[in-house]
Amino acid sequence: MSWDDAIDGVDRDTPGGRMPRAWNVAARLRAANDDISHAHVADGLPAYAELHCLSDFSFLRGASSAEQLFVRAQHCGYSALAITDECSLAGIVRGLEASRATGVRLIVGSEFALVDGTRFVLLVENAHGYPQLCGLITTARRAASKGAYRLGRAEVQAQFRDVAPGVFALWLPGAQPQAEQGAWLQQVFGERAFLAVELHREQDDVARLQVLQALAQQLGMTALASGDVHMAQRRERIVQDTLTAIRHTLPLAECGAHLFRNGERHLRTRRALGNIYPDGLLQATVELAQRCTFDISKLQYTYPRELVPQGHTPASYLRQLTEAGMRERWPDGVPKKIRDDIENELALIAELEYEAFFLTVQDVVRFARSKDILCQGRGSSANSAVCYALSITSVDPSKTRLLISRFLSKARNEPPDIDVDFEHERREEVLQYVYAKYGRERAALAATVICYRGKSAVRDVAKAFGLPPDQIALLANCYGWGNGETPMEQRIEEAGFDLANPLINKILLVTDHLRDHPRHLSQHVGGFVISDEPLSLLVPVENAAMADRTIIQWDKDDLETMKLLKVDCLALGMLTCIRKTLDLVRGHRHRDYTLATLPDEDAATYKMIQRADTVGVFQIESRAQMAMLPRLKPAEFYDLVIEVAIVRPGPIQGDMVHPYLQRRKDKSLINYPSEGVEQILGPTLGIPLFQEQVMELVIHAGYDPDEADKLRRSMAAWRRGGDMESHRLRIRALMEGKGYASSFIDQIFEQIKGFGSYGFPQSHAASFAKLVYASCWLKRHEPAAFACGLLNAQPMGFYSASQIVQDARRGSPERERVEVLPVDVLHSDWDNTLVGGRPWRSAADPGEQPAIRLGMRQVAGLSQVVAQRIVAARTQRAFADIGDLCLRAALDEKARLALAEAGALHGLVGNRNAARWVMAGVEARRPLLPGSPEERPVAFEAPRAGEEILADYRSVGLSLRQHPMALLRPQMRQRRILGLRELQGRRHGSGVHVAGLVTQRQRPATAKGTIFVTLEDEQGMINVIVWSHLALRRRRALLESRLLAVRGRWERVDGVEHLIAGDLYDLSNLLGDMQLPSRDFH
């Protein structure tokens, strides 16, 4: 079924597809404009400007994007289009981009509904009116919870009291117009108040027109036409109706009066409007539009300047801090090249007037370090020698090739992007410092637009169409599973749905339309916008879901378009882990390391990395990275930089991985067409693995640095419709002019196109590689402290607490085993801790490791407050018995049962069964009279081994007893299923039969439907590769198994071992009720 079949009365004169947002809006709209280039605005039709139009940023009301609305307005020949989302300017920047692309003038406005029912639209006339509108929206949004607003007449009057309004007000009368509402608007806005006549081909249109014209005459207001537009075209009515049902949480069949009577709330042709409205009402829209002269692209923004001490300018103070940092970073003297780079950067920063921005980031980092919060800059800012001197970044520019245009470009005329990672458990301290320093009036987080994806869209749509919950779940699973090689229709039919069913067809059509449709605003992960003046003069501010947080209504792309600077204060779990590990080493081993003082280029650490012994470390812990490590064999820091970057969609799609690995093995394959190219590509053996190398290559060929940056942006946009063809022709011409072979040029350009997929810049990879090395060094030399720190930093990373503990206890040829002790109220703190020294030794390192005592944070259902009470009471004196524990730690029933289930009372009462009994009746067992005999203790038999393991996983998420697979090993033998250690002796290519607990499932976007599954038994872990055809055939077993059996082919190549699955089946029934942690598609 097509859209035309789905709904009657469809406009067929313009394209209706949704266009995804990218930086080059003009390129995205060009195809649509070409399609409608035949449309001709006929002479004699009335001119018109639409002054009341909702985009899809009136969440769950507007059905069309700003791009779609402006394309339609251009087609219809409108002179202007106002985007008037409800109490919001969240979509206005997209309106600006679409206006630029189509030539239809944008008017900035917003719709409001007061608590007393009065409805009106405000349109910005001039630069004075814009901050007035922003302030009113901010007032309304800050007075309500996230996503809502509350506005009364008093707040409106207060906003415009004692100031000349710079806005126009359009009164939107209700079904029964109340003259008093219009009179009140006149009182506030005077002659700037207009009466909007909105007619939608309903039975009472003639009478309504007469009533409203008479009312306008009575009040002395100018009346004008208005559309109350909710969609670009009539065909989108089915979408708008569905959004209405979702908004009211009702099935469509029960929405009744909530739905519009027809599809007239679209951008109608001027001919249609001329048949509905008197000419005077249409002409009034054009006249008012002409009075709205405000251009939002001219918005002025000033960065805070209070960090500059008296007697300094921003430039002089930034230079002073940079020079002080240079002396600290290079105590033996600054290399001449670095000094020259810094001078060039400072000159460029001064020219672009970004000094205050750099000072702000430096101040935030200074605060974090003063509080011992680990932090590190990353991304393109690692190309900046100034950022390194200011201690924002940690990659020494004297040891890397800097490309400042990747970070800061005069031609780009856009703010630089500085991302700083902080410990994830302490980042809130940093955010609150920013709020405290600048005030909530001048600092807020950027927004993130949460959009529908296939699965979330089909759930809401199917519910709106009245599908039963079980069928909704089945249909949603079709969107949550699959690959590009399997058509959606096939997946849906396999799930049991009939595509010929009109209901199912409509659900799928609407779902497809709602993909990427905005659902609501959320807060950015850490992008702060800070201004010298109140932010609400620039953009509305509203409450975030979290307490003590506010967000602006624009996202990072909007900020880039509007050239507003943001400081990214991001959270990184590995920094928390490293800081906690260093604290443990300092406290228990009396070794005072910092990130900067960990021994460099440690051979033992690289040996461990080459064996892919990297569970829990940063970045190189995934199965794909582990498979790469034995092949790449990192032996120095730059190898880690490459390792971080190479297992990414960009290098994979650009066919860079295998050529690079082949050249590492066989240096005779390396060749360069010139010495200049060798200088650029030499570190990566002739393969451009990084964006900076691509930029350097084209600069070497003849681009200037700013042109090279435009190429980088084109690479990022290429897969979203960006234009690479012009670059291809020019690059070919320039490289041919240098005498490069055609095959080399073709190869380079194909690799350049690969960067259209996600890839790391070298600066970013180098920043991350610092943390890769640090985490690996700590895992190798301080395995107990690292595992303990990792557990205390959870949740984070790829691996569950169970896998982390299993890995620590198992050890490896390169690192010591670690003993792990159970949770015990007599010994455990809230956090996991290090205790004593253990005699485990390995041939690689005869040093002694402490044991890990599991903390009460591992106990499900136990709060930190309760754990702290237990520790405080225990510190005063040891617990005599269970009653003493419960009394002095004030344990409620929930805490008592949680501790009993976790086996944490072993030291007081013995086994789990006894603990459950005692804790269940602890309040009931009290003497009736003084001197009454005590109840005799009941002897309880300890639970069986399997029951203990089951209880461990249920209450602690891990078990220190036998591995569940050890208990099942006799049954595995009967089924001729091998233990994972037995695979080590198998030949490459031999058939094997194994089974293990599923601990991970991954489906990389570049793997064409292939699923990677990690299995674990008592002997270790293996990676299983499940090709897409088998994944589809054994979908249920693959996705739902806790214990998965695999028949397949064992492969061992270049030190990489994995199992290619030939068949799968589920053995979860052998585990009973045991629920095991698995990190799926993480």
UniProtKB/Swiss-Prot annotation:
Biological process terms from the Gene Ontology for this record are: DNA repair; DNA replication
Q: Which Pfam families match?
A: DNA_pol3_alpha (PF07733), DNA_pol3_finger (PF17657), HHH_6 (PF14579), PHP (PF02811), tRNA_anti-codon (PF01336)
Q: Name one GO molecular function term.
A: DNA-directed DNA polymerase activity
Q: What's the stated role of this polypeptide?
A: DNA polymerase involved in damage-induced mutagenesis and translesion synthesis (TLS). It is not the major replicative DNA polymerase.
Catalysis: reaction(s): DNA(n) + a 2'-deoxyribonucleoside 5'-triphosphate = DNA(n+1) + diphosphate
Q: Is the keyword Transferase assigned to this protein?
A: yes
Q: Which ranges form a coiled coil?
A: none
Instruction: Give the main EC class.
Output: transferase
The entry sums up its family as follows: Belongs to the DNA polymerase type-C family. DnaE2 subfamily.
- State the encoding gene: dnaE2
Principal localization? Answer: cytoplasm
Report what the protein is called.
Error-prone DNA polymerase
* Enzyme Commission number(s) from the entry: 2.7.7.7
Asked if the keyword Transmembrane helix belongs to this entry, the reply reads: no
Example GO CC term: the record gives: cytoplasm
HAMAP family found in the cross-reference section: DNApol_error_prone (MF_01902)
The alphabetized UniProt keywords are: Cytoplasm, DNA damage, DNA repair, DNA replication, DNA-directed DNA polymerase, Nucleotidyltransferase, Transferase
Location of this chain's protein in the cell: Cytoplasm
